[in-house]
Amino acid sequence: MPTVHNSEYIKELLVDNTSYKIYDINKAASDIGISLNKLPYSLRVLLENVLRTSGNKENLLVFKEWLKTKKSNTEIDFMPARVLMQDFTGVPAIVDLAAMRDAMQKIGCNPLKINPLIPVDLVIDHSVSVDSYGLKESFEQNVQMEMKRNIERYQFLKWGQQAFNNFKVVPPGTGICHQVNLEYLSKVVWYNDGTAYPDSLVGTDSHTTMVNGLSVLGWGVGGIEAEAAMLGQPLTMIIPEVIGVKLTGKLEGMATATDLVLTITEMLRRTKVVGKFVEFFGYGLSNLTISDRATISNMSPEYGATCGFFPIDQETIKYLEITGRETRQIKLVEKYATEQNLWYNFEDTQEYTEVLELDLSTVYSSLAGPKRPQDRVNLSFVESNFKNELPYFALENQDIDKKYAVANQNYEIGNGDVVIAAITSCTNTSNPSVMIGAALLAKKALEHGLNVKPWVKTSLAPGSKVVTEYLKISGLDKYLDALGFNLVGYGCTTCIGNSGSLNPEIENTINKNRLVVASVLSGNRNFEGRINPLTKASYLASPILVVAYALSGTLNIDLTTTPIGANIYLKDIWPSQKEIDAVIANSINPSMFIEKYADVFNGTKEWHDLHITTGTNYNWDKNSTYINNPPYFDNICSENTIKDIKSAKILAIFGDSITTDHISPAGSISKNSPAAKYLIEHNIEPLNFNSYGSRRGNHEVMMRGTFANIRIKNEMCNGVEGGFTINQLSGVQQTIYDAAMDYQAHDIPLVVFAGKEYGSGSSRDWAAKGPGLLGIKAIIAESFERIHRSNLVGMGILPLTFTGNNTRLSLKLDGSETIDIIGLSKNIRPFNLVKCVIKKQTNEISTIDLILQIFTENEINYIKHGSIMQFVVESLKG
């Protein structure tokens, strides 16, 4: 039985003759001398969590402190109700748990102590690629290819399901984890052992935040933090600043929820909300469905916030009803939220660190690109935006308007042509309004004699089977099929870079003529090199605009003033909101959700037929190139101290906005990369390389793939793209991996310098694990993104920031310097100042201050133990 804390706050909640115990946050707030109505709704959820899980009532006083200054420097322990994972991040997490069991056995402890104590759901959604498209058979063909490529990984996950308690796997071909979470897994109010409490979670994908649109507090963490949470370790955090966004008015004209989230992303990136909660309030909430809100919450990582929270209201109840949740559960949510002052009240006087305001009627039809999700562009300016960005792509001495013939085809392509148009990602496919809007636009386009341009690769990959069901019931699926937007899979596909190959003749034309072609997708990220290696420009857009750009085939058009064809303008085929709402009313009902999720954990015959080994500990195959026992626990009993870094060399110097995609790419493995060399040495043909993301269970592949993004630029190698550096031992340009191994052989520690927003993007912990295995001891940057900073600490790597006006540029670093970081071996505390001594080859020495970006005492312990994983094993072995 779990330990009961603060029992004097337990009271009974009666819902239809069922009695639940709840922790009364109204009484708790009164006892510490605050008005609960002044606390943001997201912090009320945190207050309940601390009240229910903390043994020290004094911990509640931090909320009183927060109300005084609207910020806090005091840490709390957060205990999520559950954990959500996807397979790219989930496989390495289960590998780590399996390795922990071996480590426990090695030191004479019970390996079964390594077991999730809270529910863990893993949804396999990241592995399907768009190999086949434009055919009615595409879905089946892609599923077969997925199973063939990933059989070893899936066998491992099935082993994990039988080996670990509280661990369930949603098989491939079912949906995207965040949409499955929204439509099925989330309860809004959880109950266990007779106690009801707010649903909450952390997930190993940064877009876990999507569920905040359903009033479930949650955010993305690295796999190593998620592992700790599974094993009962609290997630230590400082109560964040909360930015209130007051919404007024309603969307008008052609504006969609996608346009709204791109507008919010642009606005909040400028406001700088990294590490902060964002909470939406105001009368505008009544004009946003849960699907609209989920779209906004999904892109929290893109605007930098820990989460984008919407409080419970009548829309929450309507969504639970339409998605087929049990009546008992819905009544519990309504009664609990009302009793605990978690139900949104327009008259509440909640206070925020800062308040921003957005009138929904000012939102215009938009895209974002060509390489960052915060770079919103009005639809009417996309053509000029793309042309203005062309110089960035280094098109010197080229006729940018020239068209080039495609072999064996009767068309030409040029710069700005759209070669990928993908309706993809849970960000938008979870929203019936934009999905039905896209289908209606397809219908009208066909009725006006329009068609998709032949050079455009089209695909439809929704986040759940419910989407294809309502498209089928509405009769609109046939119009999308007719334009080539056939179902290719239920998974992330193009949004995460699994866009598949283009037509070989098109690829040859692009490469031969160095064309800057584009992808337009309904996803949430468009970082360089992410969507497809050949689409240097990528624009995020609503599914409706994805179809529109597939029809135009180019960015070199103003769709607001120029006809798409034969005097047909976009406005002529754009569906009205009234048309969309009518289809929704006639095509979506609770029974389809109940039916499609009835067998969500069952899977296909191919899944059932997977042969697996059983047992407590995993039987590692030393020859496997997918699953390998990692070396994190080789020195499990080593001395737990922090030492100064002496005589370190600089492995790389990076600019601003280095993403986790740059650090640890998820996409295809280049044939000339260190990872490819390793795979070839292990008799893997290039055709079977699969992706970096699929091989995250093998540290040998992943450390070789660290900083291997084809678009990354190390400032030590002027003008060179890709994962290269100058090895200071030889003076030779090498791959970053090869240079790092040379430094390791000489026992030389490494550091990396960078600019602003280092580690933005996905939550992938391999962006910290990889650098750790390369021997990097510290990253020195102007600023870090939230999740990546936590991941670095979790792997024992020091995140350090400059003080004053110092930057890598002001210091005039060229990479030949030797670095000492002094002051670590003393009694270090969070946010300590440490000294960085920079020794140039000219013997010139300078010393600067750096700020240790370690937030809590727990994080100090992770650094001392070498990683959060070693800390957990040490904690459990007693």
From Swiss-Prot:
Residues the record lists as binding [4Fe-4S] cluster: C426, C492, C495
EC nos: 4.2.1.3, 4.2.1.99
An example Gene Ontology molecular-function term: 2-methylisocitrate dehydratase activity
Pathway: Carbohydrate metabolism; tricarboxylic acid cycle; isocitrate from oxaloacetate: step 2/2; Organic acid metabolism; propanoate degradation
BP terms from Gene Ontology: propionate metabolic process, methylcitrate cycle; tricarboxylic acid cycle
Family: Belongs to the aconitase/IPM isomerase family.
InterPro entries, A to Z: AcnA_IRP_Swivel, Acnase/IPM_dHydase_lsu_aba_1/3, Acoase/IPM_deHydtase_lsu_aba, Aconitase/3IPM_dehydase_swvl, Aconitase/IRP2, Aconitase_4Fe-4S_BS, Aconitase_4Fe-4S_dom, AconitaseA/IPMdHydase_ssu_swvl
Naturally occurring in which organism (per UniProt): Rickettsia typhi (strain ATCC VR-144 / Wilmington)
Entries under Pfam families matching the protein: Aconitase (PF00330), Aconitase_C (PF00694)
Claim: Oxidoreductase is one of the keywords in the record: no
Keywords: 4Fe-4S, Iron, Iron-sulfur, Lyase, Metal-binding, RNA-binding, Tricarboxylic acid cycle
Catalysed reaction equations from the record: citrate = D-threo-isocitrate; (2S,3R)-3-hydroxybutane-1,2,3-tricarboxylate = 2-methyl-cis-aconitate + H2O
Chain's gene name: acnA
NCBIfam families recorded: aconitase_1 (TIGR01341), PRK09277.1 (NF006757), PRK12881.1 (NF009520)
Protein name (record): Aconitate hydratase A
Cofactor: [4Fe-4S] cluster
Function: Involved in the catabolism of short chain fatty acids (SCFA) via the tricarboxylic acid (TCA)(acetyl degradation route) and probably the 2-methylcitrate cycle I (propionate degradation route). Catalyzes the reversible isomerization of citrate to isocitrate via cis-aconitate. Could catalyze the hydration of 2-methyl-cis-aconitate to yield (2R,3S)-2-methylisocitrate. The apo form of AcnA functions as a RNA-binding regulatory protein.
Note on cofactor: Binds 1 [4Fe-4S] cluster per subunit.
